[in-house]
C-alpha cells in the first residue's frame, strides 16, 4: 500500500511539473522517439513522432562535473544495478566499501539507462535521495525519481536520439494564444543567452498578434531568472493552458519550432543487461562538496539522476539479455565481490552521482 501511495504521489508531482513547464526551442525527430534534456531547466522532455509526450524533472551535473552537452544515443538498460564505486571516490570515502548492491541504499536506484558513448560514463537513472530532484548536483549523470526512471526505462527505446541542450530561456504560446516567457539560471556560467535575438522574436510575435508587450516586463523576467513561467500578454492570475507551442526564438522569428523531418527509424531492439550488472560512476574531478545550485522556483516532480559508466572488460558488454525481473526485486552482488552495505544515515551527497 505504501509503494502504491508513493507511486501515485510521484505521478501527481510529475503531472504538476508538466503543467507549469515551458518547452524549449528544439526540432525533435519527426519519426520515432527523441529525448531532450535542458540543463538550465532541469527537465527531460520526451517526444514521440515529433510531439511532446512527457516531461520529467531531473537533476543534472554540477559545474565541476557537468553533464556532457550535445547529441547522444540511448544505450543499454540495467535493472537493479550494482554500483561499483570508482577508485577516486573509494579513496575519498576511505571506508573500504567497493560496491553497493541493489536496494534502498543504492544511489543508482532501480534502473540505469546508458546515455551516449559508454566512455562518457553518463546515464539516466533513479536515486536513493529523491529530494535532490530537480537540481544541479550530480557527478554528470541525469538523475530521476525512481518511479519516473522506471517508467522512462520501460518507454524509451535503445538507439533513440538524445539531445542535451543549454537554453537559458523558453518562449511559448499557449492554447489561449497568450505569450509566456521563462528565464533560467546559468549553472555552468556559459552566459549564452542571446537577449537581442529573444527580444526580436517577442517583438515579431507581438506585431503579428496586435499586442503590446512592455520592454521593462521582459527585462525584469530576464534579470530575475526564477525559472517561473510569466505571461507577457495576460492579466495576473491567468493560468498557463496546454498545449504549448515553442517559438523559434533562437532564430529571432515569430515562427513556431517544428519537428525535423527524419526517415522512419528501423525497429529498435532493446538492449537489457543482466540483473545486477555492475555500473561504475566516474567522478575523478568532483571532490568539491560546494552547495548545489539553487533550484528554479517552478519545481514539478523531484527527480534524481546519477553518473555511472559501464565496467570495461568485466561487464557483459551492451548485449541483449533475458527480460528483467520486476524492479522491486533487488539483485544480489556477485559472491566474488564482498559488499559492505552503506547505512541510510550516510551523507547522501557522497552517494549521489
Language model feature labels by segment:
Residues 138-155:
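Short beta-strand-centered segments at strand-helix junctions
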Amino acid at each position: 500500500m505504501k509503494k502504491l501511495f508513493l507511486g501515485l504521489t510521484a505521478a501527481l508531482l510529475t503531472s504538476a511539473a508538466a503543467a507549469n513547464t515551458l518547452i524549449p526551442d528544439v526540432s525533435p525527430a519527426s519519426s520515432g522517439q527523441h529525448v531532450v534534456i535542458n540543463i538550465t531547466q532541469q527537465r527531460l522532455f520526451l517526444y514521440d513522432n515529433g510531439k511532446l509526450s512527457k516531461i520529467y524533472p531531473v537533476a543534472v551535473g554540477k559545474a565541476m562535473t557537468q553533464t556532457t552537452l550535445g547529441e547522444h544515443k540511448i544505450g543499454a538498460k540495467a535493472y537493479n544495478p550494482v554500483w561499483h564505486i570508482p577508485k577516486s571516490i573509494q579513496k575519498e570515502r576511505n571506508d573500504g566499501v567497493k560496491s553497493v548492491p541493489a536496494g534502498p541504499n543504492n544511489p543508482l536506484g532501480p534502473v540505469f539507462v546508458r546515455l551516449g558513448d559508454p566512455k562518457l560514463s553518463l546515464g539516466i537513472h533513479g536515486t536513493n535521495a529523491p529530494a535532490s530532484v530537480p537540481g544541479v548536483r550530480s557527478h554528470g549523470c541525469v538523475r530521476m525519481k525512481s518511479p519516473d526512471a522506471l517508467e522512462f526505462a520501460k518507454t524509451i527505446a535503445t538507439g533513440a536520439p538524445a539531445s542535451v541542450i543549454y537554453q537559458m530561456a523558453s518562449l511559448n504560446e499557449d492554447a489561449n494564444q497568450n505569450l509566456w516567457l521563462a528565464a533560467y539560471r546559468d549553472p555552468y556560467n556559459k552566459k549564452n543567452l542571446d537577449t537581442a535575438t529573444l527580444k526580436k522574436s517577442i517583438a515579431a510575435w507581438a506585431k503579428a498578434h496586435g499586442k503590446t508587450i512592455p520592454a521593462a516586463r521582459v527585462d525584469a523576467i530576464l534579470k530575475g531568472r526564477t525559472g517561473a513561467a510569466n505571461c507577457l500578454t495576460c492579466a495576473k492570475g491567468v493560468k498557463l493552458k496546454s498545449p504549448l507551442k515553442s517559438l523559434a526564438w533562437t532564430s529571432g522569428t515569430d515562427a513556431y519550432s517544428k519537428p525535423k523531418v527524419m526517415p522512419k527509424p528501423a525497429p529498435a531492439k532493446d538492449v537489457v543487461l543482466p540483473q545486477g550488472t555492475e555500473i561504475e560512476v566516474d567522478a575523478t574531478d568532483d571532490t568539491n562538496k560546494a552547495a548545489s545550485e539553487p533550484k528554479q522556483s517552478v519545481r514539478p516532480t523531484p527527480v534524481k539522476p546519477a553518473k555511472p559508466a559501464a565496467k570495461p572488460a568485466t561487464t557483459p558488454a551492451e548485449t541483449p539479455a533475458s527480460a528483467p525481473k520486476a524492479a522491486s526485486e533487488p539483485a544480489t552482488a556477485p559472491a566474488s565481490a564482498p559488499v559492505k552495505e552503506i547505512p541510510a544515515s550516510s551523507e547522501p551527497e557522497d552517494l549521489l552521482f
